[in-house]
A protein has these predicted regions:
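Mature catalytic domains of secreted/periplasmic carbohydrate-active enzymes
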Residues: 1-382, 391-418
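Short, conserved beta-strand segments of beta-strand-rich sandwich/propeller modules, principally
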Residues: 387-389
Length: 418
């Protein structure tokens, strides 16, 4: 049998989370920029109604499993009272310089049972020592250590490649810190990653999107691929990040018309989670420090629709082998199938066919697919059938099917299927 890449227990837990909420919040929230210069005065930061509880409450209500906060974006402004620089909440008027956005968000997530993770931009447009590689590596390692030791447990540490094209960092040092202080946290895309960037900011994964990879794109601004360190595991699943407002990661006033449509958000779910990836949907808090009602409402409507579609399977089976047949007590209308491999055994299926039993006892092919991995959601025109059959056409080893479920979403109580 071919030796297959296998996920760690931490990777499997992360993949089971499936849905994360990104919160881009910081200096840019008050300046109207996407990328700050690092010259904006700390006095600009003053979210007078800041409420991390509201963020976590929305995440919980919508059904997100984890929340990632931009602890430091490219402008270098830190949302925690770091000892490494004066360019932080400590120098802002907010809470008289005594506030800690990261700390309050971590506690709110814990209170609501939401996993917490941090984004820490390697590129720093404010820090004077950035041009000196050794000095900045030490500076960045200190910031990373503060976050890893002060705000855990963390489910993910997000390393953004934007602005770092061609720049070398001491990733071995940074990765060793994560492994030491937060061994179960996922490491995003850089150094020795345990998860990777899908390669776009549309929330849509290519298909097939295999869980094994040898590299990933650095950023949207170059086609160059990252050189990961040799210790990188072969199993590196993808995460799809996308803002709920078209091409706007940070909040700006009077841009509600940029909110993605409900139909687009549903399609993003099918193109991310439905292709075996995690979805990280950005809801940016506003200058008050609150997630706008319109943004929260759009996310909640999306997630409620998803739950309505998939909370009540017509039938579910599991097992192994090259063929599995699901039978119904009577002819049943079906338009969706969800497949999951037991990825503890690796990604074994390379191609498959789904068939429906016909009235004369024969079989009609509905579709063919390739990657299954953690999850594959297949949509098709509604059929009336007494049985569905999954046939494995190509595989690396005997498949272990964790879940084979059938659904009918073409119901009057659901939004029209897109």
């Amino acid at each position: 049998m071919k030796e297959l890449a296998l996920p760690s227990a931490s990777q499997r837990r992360w993949q089971d989370m499936e849905l994360g909420m990104f919160c881009h919040f910081g200096m840019n929230t008050f300046t109207g920029k996407e990328w700050g210069e690092g010259t904006e005065p700390a006095s600009c930061f003053n979210p007078t109604a800041f409420d991390a509880d509201q963020w976590a409450r929305i995440a919980k209500r919508a059904g997100f499993s984890y929340l990632i906060l931009t602890a430091k974006h490219h402008d270098g402004f830190c949302l925690w009272p770091t000892a490494t620089t004066d360019y932080s909440v400590r120098s802002s008027p907010w809470r008289g310089g005594q506030g800690d956005v990261v700390g309050e968000t971590a506690r709110a997530c814990e209170a609501y049972g939401i996993g917490f993770g941090v984004y820490l931009s390697p590129w720093d447009r404010h820090e004077p020592c950035y041009s000196e590689q050794e000095a900045y590596d030490h500076f960045y390692a200190e910031q990373l250590t503060e976050l890893l030791t002060g705000y855990g447990p963390l489910v993910e540490v997000w390393f953004d490649g934007a602005g770092s094209e061609g720049r070398t960092y001491d990733w071995k040092r940074m990765m060793s810190l994560v492994e030491r202080y937060q061994p179960d946290a996922m490491r995003f895309n850089m150094g020795i990653p345990t998860i990777r960037w899908v390669g776009n900011e549309d929330g849509i994964a290519p298909y097939p999107c295999w869980n094994t990879a040898e590299s990933a794109r650095v950023s949207l601004f170059t086609k160059n691929m990252l050189t990961w360190l040799p210790e990188t595991p072969r199993w590196v699943p993808a995460e799809c990040d996308v803002p709920i407002r078209e091409q706007s990661w940070f909040w700006r006033p009077n841009e509600e018309e940029k909110l993605l449509s409900h139909e687009r958000l549903i399609e993003i779910y099918y193109g991310s989670v439905g292709r075996g990836c995690n979805l990280l949907l950005n809801l940016a808090p506003d200058a008050r420090g609150l997630i706008p009602e319109a943004d929260a409402g759009a996310a909640i409507r999306m997630m409620d629709d998803i739950r309505n579609r998939f909370e009540a399977p017509l039938e579910t089976i599991a097992g192994g082998g090259d063929a599995m047949t699901m039978t119904f007590a009577r002819a049943t209308r079906v338009d969706h199938v969800v497949l999951m491999e037991d990825i503890a055994y690796g990604e074994r299926i390379r191609s498959y066919a789904l068939e429906a039993e016909t009235a004369d006892g024969g079989w009609m092919e509905l579709l063919r697919g390739s990657a299954v991995g953690h999850k594959k959601i297949d949509r098709f025109e509604p059929v009336e059938t007494s049985a569905l059959r999954l046939r494995i056409l190509k595989r690396e080893a005997e498949p272990h099917i964790r879940l084979f479920s059938a659904y009918c979403t073409a119901r009057d109580d659901l939004n029209p299927r897109i």
